[in-house]
């Protein structure tokens, strides 16, 4: 039996099959899903439920070509929303659709393409375009159509490898996704074409990315005794570079080169020779040998010490490998910073004959691209770390969970894994070992390790309760070691150089280097690797080159959506896990986005809230309903009109509730950026209370004006994609307020700075962070509940000790912790935990009925009321609605919303009133998969799937109605409600 067949029981085929269907049909067709359900022997409703969870899937046909506009953080601050609207306008897409009338293009937004330094990035099919603006969308479409035409006409030339390949001069070019977006693919092809035309004796070599994408396309000419670097190379430069360094006897080529030099604006002898980029002299560990090796060449990797660490690992005991990792003090690079050596020790000591290693490459942060570049440019280093992990813990299967959007990284890894398999290196690992790729389907929450496991097992990516942790009970209940891409890439370096060498870099508590995706309003964006402990100012100024021309840096956003913002005044702080956390941010996976004075902090906070609102798994009420409501409150700051008193306090209080009451890390960190911005830029938030946006970003609060300094140069008219400026030559311009989209492009191109935002500047004032202190656990085998000590008994929940209000909990089974009405305060964790599901922990101190607990329950009930239509007069549950009993008991109140409530659905056996459903999911638990949750976040609904509600027989109808705590489900043959 082949290794792949040995592991079929671990990886569910549902998600891979759905991805294959989407590729084939460009959408998920009903008949294809029905056939898939029959073939996999799973309920059709489960197929629809899973498919609706992941954003990569669509149920309506799309155009022949798909345009994906990146709206990640770096692209957003560069105007991605305006680029998206420009594509729609250029292609005449109707307001209620996303496909052009000719069916050629479908335009959509994507959370991140991982090309942040080339913002705004746009992907059309497999081609990526960088630095797209509203005024260039037409050219992008034309260029793409020309590429398609050329690809269809081109035939590949399979030249024989030269026996003297290693002695040949080399022209090295990176073709990673970012550099391709800058045109390196075309430059690569141009050098190949010149080589063939002139019969030159050089080799065009694809190499790993140098990380300096602002210099791309970067070309290095490697001769016997020298290296020459050319940056920002264009196609018309190629022949001159070749003529500069190589000679040929081909008279035709020489005459063409002579004519080029004679007529060209850039003659071959005058081309600027770039100095070796200073970034290459910086300390590099995981990006070592950048720009030198062919990423897919196993020989290149071995020539520079590749797999020496793996060979050494084969001579060491697992305990010795773990010891070396502990000595290095490597911490996980995925965000949490958990000690890697300790995690490997736990996996090694976990009982079980069968174990799994998973590389979490689901880089979902909008603004991060480190993992993509590492996988595309240093795939063998990442894989070597994974193989060492498998050897250490005794795993027979390794899985790389990677985003489907990273098409080039997927292709590179597929080819590299195949080469490793052919090399026989897997034979040194446990019997039957295999390494496989698993493609994710677009869900940020699947970056959370337990949600990722659910996805591999063919379910919706909803985080599991912890403990147990994956290292003890992970994939299919097996011990599972999970680290991210950069963490695995560090392992070979540690084993070769020794843990002490790695430990010597960094600070006393954080060691080694960290790769960052530097992007946004900075001169030199790209992948950088810096020693941990460097200051933010050093990163922005030395690596990033400072602010863009005529701008000043305002702040950096670090840690992705779950991180925070650090203002310019605090750029002297050091970048390490502890310092960032103390300043309201976090290391995260390594996204670092620079913003300048033209960016609005309220708008930035709102952007991240909108992202997280759509990415919530939808399980717990504080994340599912709390984040959208917080989003509504922050959005009201950007609207013109009177603001309710105490609005900023309400925003902060709700944000704290969400932090303390969400089940998983996504919800608990969702308000971080809002709280951080509110803390560091309080004056800017107060300006919005007065209907002013100092940055000029919020449309309703901004009205650009042209001053008398205008000289009538018309540059603003040429740059305005909305056509909102009128001007006669040499006369003052006039902005049409009703047409202006407040993108600010006119202001940035005006040479006289004559376009201004009349909002007055506000002095910034810091507001102290309000943090809940954590309480130390008590000694002994006890727990403390409401001040009284009780003996600690493993496996118990708070329901075993106290009477709590419950809505979603069922003694007969089913999933709980959706409503959080049963929440209790855990003083040791410093947050609320579900009393129905959370196992009590030794030494912890709990509150079940304090004022803070009652206030939290009131907030949870109020958020659930958002979905309620309040048509209670005719409700069958009137007078015996447990939900409204709690609403009255805790004094919950309905929050204003603009929801459109569905009309009740009536069948022969039941009535379903969606306007009263609170998504407790009790009905799902007893329906035998005839009901399921479809979609996610605040779009989640209970549905029978493609089958109508009429498909529920009387027995099932009675079951689901009997457990409904509201009037959402009513049995027509007598009320079975308890």
Which sequence ranges carry the predicted segments?
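Terminal amphipathic helices with adjacent charged low-complexity linkers/tails
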Residues: 234, 269, 397-411, 415-417, ...
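Small-residue-enriched alpha-helical segments and adjacent helix-cap loops
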Residues: 20, 24-109, 166-214, 220, ...
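Conserved phosphate/anionic-ligand binding catalytic regions in large, soluble enzymes, centered on
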Residues: 178-180, 325-347, 442-454, 613-625, ...
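Fe-S ferredoxin-like electron-transfer domains
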Residues: 83-118, 124-170, 226-327, 461-476, ...
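Cysteine-centered iron-sulfur cluster-binding motifs in ferredoxin-type domains/subunits
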Residues: 41, 70-78, 110-119, 174-182, ...
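Hydrophobic alpha-helical positions that pack around
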Residues: 278, 282, 410-532
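Short amphipathic, charge-patterned alpha-helical segments
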Residues: 385-387, 532-548, 797-803
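Accessory "access/gating" subregions that flank catalytic or transport cores
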Residues: 311-351, 503-504, 509, 517, ...
């Amino acid at each position: 039996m082949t290794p792949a067949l040995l592991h079929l029981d671990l990886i569910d085929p549902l998600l891979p099959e759905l991805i294959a269907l989407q590729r084939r049909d460009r959408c998920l067709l009903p008949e294809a899903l029905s056939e898939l359900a029959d073939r996999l022997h799973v309920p059709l409703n489960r197929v629809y439920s899973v498919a609706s969870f992941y954003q990569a899937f669509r149920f309506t046909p799309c155009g022949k070509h798909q345009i994906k506009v990146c709206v990640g953080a770096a692209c957003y601050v560069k105007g991605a929303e305006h680029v998206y609207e420009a594509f729609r306008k250029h292609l005449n897409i109707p307001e209620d659709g996303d496909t052009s009338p000719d069916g050629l293009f479908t335009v959509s937004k994507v959370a991140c393409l991982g090309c942040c330094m080339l913002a705004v990035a746009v992907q059309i099919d497999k081609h990526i375009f960088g630095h797209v603006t509203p005024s260039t969308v037409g050219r992008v479409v034309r260029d793409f159509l020309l590429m398609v035409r050329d690809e269809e006409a081109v035939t590949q030339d399979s030249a024989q490898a030269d026996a003297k390949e290693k002695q040949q001069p080399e022209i090295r070019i990176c073709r990673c996704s970012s550099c391709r977006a800058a045109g390196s693919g075309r430059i690569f092809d141009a050098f190949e074409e010149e080589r063939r035309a002139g019969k030159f004796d050089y080799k065009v070599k694809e190499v790993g990315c140098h990380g300096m994408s602002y210099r791309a396309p970067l070309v290095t000419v490697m001769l016997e005794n020298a290296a020459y670097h050319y940056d920002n190379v264009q196609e018309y430069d190629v022949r001159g570079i070749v003529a500069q360094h190589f000679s040929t006897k081909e008279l035709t080529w020489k005459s063409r080169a002579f004519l080029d030099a004679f007529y060209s604006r850039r003659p071959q002898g005058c081309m600027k020779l770039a100095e070796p980029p200073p970034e290459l002299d910086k300390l590099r560990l995981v990006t070592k040998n950048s720009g030198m090796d062919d990423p897919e060449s196993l020989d290149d990797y071995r020539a520079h010490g590749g797999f020496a660490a793996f060979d050494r690992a084969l001579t060491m005991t697992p305990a010795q490998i773990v010891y070396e990792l502990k000595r290095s003090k490597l911490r996980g690079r995925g965000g949490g910073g958990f000690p890697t050596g300790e995690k490997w020790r736990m996996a090694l000591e976990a009982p079980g004959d069968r174990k799994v290693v998973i590389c979490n490459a689901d880089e979902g942060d909008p603004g991060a691209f480190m993992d993509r570049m590492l996988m595309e440019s240093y795939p063998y280093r990442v894989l070597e770390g994974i193989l060492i992990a498998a050897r250490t813990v005794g795993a027979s299967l390794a899985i790389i969970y990677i985003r489907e959007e990273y098409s080039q990284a997927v292709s590179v890894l597929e080819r590299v894994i195949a080469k490793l398999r052919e090399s026989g290196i897997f034979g040194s690992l446990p019997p039957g070992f295999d390494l496989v790729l698993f493609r994710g389907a677009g869900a940020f929450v699947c970056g959370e390790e337990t949600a990722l496991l659910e996805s591999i097992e063919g379910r919706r990516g909803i985080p599991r309760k912890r403990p147990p942790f994956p290292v003890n009970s992970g994939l299919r209940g097996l011990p599972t070691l999970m680290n991210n891409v950069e963490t695995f890439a560090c392992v070979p370096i540690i084993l070769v150089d020794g843990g002490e060498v790695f430990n010597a870099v960094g600070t006393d508590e954080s060691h080694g280097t960290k790769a960052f995706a530097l992007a946004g309003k900075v001169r030199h964006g790209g992948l950088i690797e810096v020693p941990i402990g460097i200051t933010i100012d050093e990163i922005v100024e030395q690596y990033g080159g400072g602010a863009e021309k005529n701008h000043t840096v305002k702040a950096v956003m670090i840690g992705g959506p779950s991180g925070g913002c650090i203002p310019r005044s605090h750029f002297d702080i050091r970048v390490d896990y502890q310092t960032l956390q103390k300043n309201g941010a976090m290391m995260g996976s390594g996204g670092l986005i620079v913003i300048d004075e033209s960016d609005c902090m309220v708008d930035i906070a709102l952007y991240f809230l909108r992202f997280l609102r759509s990415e919530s798994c939808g399980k717990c009420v504080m994340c599912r309903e709390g984040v959208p409501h917080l989003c509504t409150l922050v959005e009201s700051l950007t609207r013109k009109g009177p603001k309710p008193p105490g609005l900023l306090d309400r925003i902060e209080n709700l944000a704290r509730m969400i932090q303390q009451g969400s089940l998983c890390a996504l919800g608990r960190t969702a308000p971080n950026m809002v709280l951080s911005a509110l803390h560091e830029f309080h004056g800017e938030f107060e300006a919005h209370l007065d209907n002013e946006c100092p940055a000029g970003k919020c449309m309703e609060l901004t009205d650009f004006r042209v001053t008398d300094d205008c000289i009538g140069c018309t540059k603003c008219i040429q740059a305005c994609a909305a056509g909102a400026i009128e001007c006669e030559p040499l006369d003052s311009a006039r902005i049409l307020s009703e047409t202006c989209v407040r993108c600010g492009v006119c202001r940035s191109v005006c040479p006289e700075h004559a376009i201004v935002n009349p909002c007055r500047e506000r002095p910034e004032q810091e507001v102290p962070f309000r943090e809940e202190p954590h309480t130390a656990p008590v000694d002994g085998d006890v727990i403390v509940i409401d001040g009284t000590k009780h003996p600690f008994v493993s496996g118990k929940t708070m329901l075993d000790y106290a009477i709590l209000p419950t809505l979603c909990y069922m003694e007969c089974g089913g999933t709980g912790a959706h409503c959080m009405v049963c929440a209790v305060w855990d003083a040791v964790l410093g947050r609320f935990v579900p009393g129905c599901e959370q196992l009590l922990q030794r030494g912890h101190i709990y509150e079940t009925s304090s004022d803070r607990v009652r206030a939290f329950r009131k907030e949870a009930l109020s958020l659930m009321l958002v979905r309620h239509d309040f048509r209670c007069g005719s409700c069958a549950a009137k007078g015996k609605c447990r939900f409204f009993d709690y609403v009255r008991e805790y004094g919950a109140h309905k929050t204003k919303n603009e929801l459109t409530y569905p009309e009740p659905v009536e069948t022969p056996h039941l009535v379903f009133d969606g306007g009263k459903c609170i998504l407790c999911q009790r009905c799902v638990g007893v329906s035998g998969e005839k009901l399921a949750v479809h979609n996610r976040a605040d779009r989640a609904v209970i549905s029978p799937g493609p089958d109508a509600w009429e498909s529920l027989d009387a027995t099932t109808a009675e079951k689901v109605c009997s457990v409904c705590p509201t009037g959402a489900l009513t049995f027509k043959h007598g009320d079975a409600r308890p």
